[in-house]
From Swiss-Prot:
The species this protein was found in: Thioalkalivibrio sulfidiphilus (strain HL-EbGR7)
The protein, known as: UPF0758 protein Tgr7_0100
GO molecular function, one term: metal ion binding
InterPro entries named among the record's database cross-references: MPN, RadC_JAB, RuvA_2-like, UPF0758, UPF0758_CS, UPF0758_N
PANTHER family named among the record's database cross-references: DNA REPAIR PROTEIN RADC, UPF0758 PROTEIN YEES-RELATED
Binding site for Zn(2+): H173, H175, D186
Biological processes annotated in GO: proteolysis
Family: Belongs to the UPF0758 family.
Keyword Nucleotidyltransferase: no
Keywords: Hydrolase, Metal-binding, Metalloprotease, Protease, Zinc
Domain MPN: 102-223
Record bears the keyword Nucleus: no
Length: 223
């Protein structure tokens, strides 16, 4: 049965307008994004099929162009639309820490870092640069790929910190696996960065690992 023949309060779009987006299931939200189904399937049916194929909403949102576009009902145009939506969401959440804002809430800082890094399908290493009053100067993604001692260069981190005239910074990187537990490599590169930055009187306040949850090196006593 076409969605247009469903009772009004069961149609995803009408349900969202009357009850809010939080009332919708993952399949219903995805169906609104898809707009149409395929032969023999409504948009909701197709959404359920895609969620099953990818293993849930998050893996679908993290899929690369090739795997995303190979699924029936999707393609490069939908992939581009999805990336635009995700980036708008990241930017919206990022506004919680604008330039000049002081870091008064660890929770706000972590939400910001999660918004920026959580959904990347590859590892990204970033720095949040702060002034001597712990106000935000800039956020930069510096390295992509496998985060280890060979790919994160302390000299470049120091160079960018000095360019921003930063007095302190927060390191962050994501684990695409969703497991936020720091590795020994994470601990080693954190020590190298801390020591390199200390030579120019710049403090490392924390290193946050972003996965399905967040791990703070400062809270663990790993700094």
């Amino acid at each position: 049965m076409p969605i247009t023949d469903w009772p009004a309060d069961e149609r995803p779009r009408e349900k969202l307008l009357s009850r809010g987006a939080a009332a919708l299931s993952d399949a219903e939200l995805l169906a609104i994004f898809l707009r149409t189904g395929v032969a023999g399937k409504t948009a909701v049916d197709l959404a359920r099929e895609l969620l099953s194929r990818f293993g849930g909403l998050r893996p679908l949102l993290q899929a690369d162009l090739v795997s995303f576009s190979s699924a029936r009902g999707l393609g490069s145009a939908k992939y581009a639309q999805l990336q635009a939506v995700l980036e708008m969401g990241r930017r919206h959440l990022s506004e919680s820490l604008a330039r000049g804002d002081a870091l008064t809430s660890p929770d706000d800082t972590r939400r910001f870092l999660a918004a920026r890094l959580r959904d990347y399908p590859f590892e990204v290493f970033a720095c949040l640069f702060l002034d001597n009053r712990h106000r935000v100067i800039a956020f930069e993604e510096l390295f992509r790929g496998t985060i280890d001692g060979a790919s994160v260069h302390p000299r470049e981190v120091v160079r960018r910190a000095l360019a921003h005239n930063a007095a302190a910074l927060i390191l962050a990187h994501n684990h695409p696996s969703g497991v936020a537990e720091p590795s020994r490599s994470d601990e080693a590169i954190t020590r190298r960065l801390r020591d390199a930055l200390a030579l120019v009187d710049i403090r490392v306040l924390d290193h946050v690992v972003v996965g399905d949850s967040l791990v703070s090196f400062a809270e663990r006593g790993l700094l």
